[in-house]
Amino acid sequence: MAYLGEKIGKLGFGLMRLPKNGEIIDIEQTKEMVDLFMDAGFTYFDTAWAYEGSENAIRQALVERYPRESYQLATKNAAWINCKTKEEAVSQFDTSLRQTGAGYFDFYLLHNLGEGRSHFFDDF
């Protein structure tokens, strides 16, 4: 696959640890943070299937509120969790698409691949 020369800003919005209201992600505060980030001219958001609740949070705070072409969204395959077959990896990708509601990802990364797991992805 060829590099397409995608341009992204120098600062990305990571969604690993979001503000919480008790045990659940505070969506209203996350929306405010997303708005401040976008208003400052930044557009790259980074989430992951393994960041509990973050894909649903980005759907509510970004995807449902901004035109899809106005931001770049990356998520990750949690290679260390339940991805020993092509079917498991595809299932995790499909789950991420559904949870974010984004329609597509600008970037899809293999998260924490590690030497002991890379052969699974070489196989498929």
Task: Label each region the model flagged.
Residues 57-60, 76, 88-95:
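Generic beta-strand or strand-like secondary-structure segments
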Residues 65-66, 74-75, 124:
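Short alpha-helix boundary/capping motifs
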Residues 16-28, 76-90, 116-120:
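Active-site mouth loops of central-metabolism enzymes
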Residues 49, 56-57, 77, 115, ...:
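A sequence-level detector of short, solvent-exposed, charge-rich linear segments
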Residues 35, 83-124:
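Glycine/proline-rich, positively charged
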Residues 69-82, 108-111:
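A short, structured active-site edge motif that brings together acidic residues
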